[in-house]
Regions:
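Solvent-exposed loop/turn and edge beta-strand elements of beta-rich ligand-binding domains
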Residues: 2-173
Length: 173
């Protein structure tokens, strides 16, 4: 009986030490970071990584399309930038890679809120876009699956008075 109590006490002490030790050695929480506000002409970088696992790949230029999908939420005054499922023309938004032997390389291109149809908003809202890679003709190349991007249009706020600036907007991705 005494042996059972002894082991129960050791187990309880070990459990308390693990909880206490974890808290004692924990780092301070990371500082909260906020996305920077963008303007209608701010460049939003989009990245493409070209990876060759085996062999040599020929030079290739990847092109992309952006499709406006839907409004996630918007105020009553706002109008959507496009009809649902509208493909936005991104002529000249390609990434070119030279011939490569085993390895990977990343490049980027940019889009702006104006190119996404949000240059002259009529109100606040959150809009969803699909970015997809146009499939090329290179043998043994797997083209990337679509990715999604949400863009939020918010009222610009005066830094001093903290009041909304009517008719002025900022963007968050």
């Amino acid at each position: 009986m005494k042996l059972k109590k002894f082991f129960a006490g050791v187990l309880a002490a070990a459990m308390m030490l693990t909880v206490g030790a974890t808290a004692a050695f924990a780092d301070t929480p990371a500082a909260i970071t906020h996305n920077q506000a963008l303007t209608a002409t701010s460049e939003i970088p989009l990245y493409k990584t070209y990876e060759v696992k085996n062999g040599t790949a020929p030079a290739e230029t990847f092109s992309f399309q952006v499709k406006y999908l839907q409004v996630i939420r918007q105020d009553k005054a706002a109008t959507a930038p496009y009809n649902t499922e509208t493909v936005i023309n991104l002529t000249g938004k390609e990434t070119a890679f030279g011939s490569m032997t085993k390895g990977s390389e990343s490049k980027s291109f940019t889009v702006t809120p104006t190119e996404l149809g949000l240059g002259n908003p009529t109100g606040t809202g959150k809009y969803l876009y699909e970015i997809s890679e146009n499939a090329g003709q290179t043998v043994a190349t797997t083209y990337a699956a679509p990715v999604y991007m949400a863009v939020t249009v918010a009222h610009k706020v005066d830094a001093t008075t903290k009041q909304i600036k009517n008719g002025e907007y900022e963007y968050y991705v």
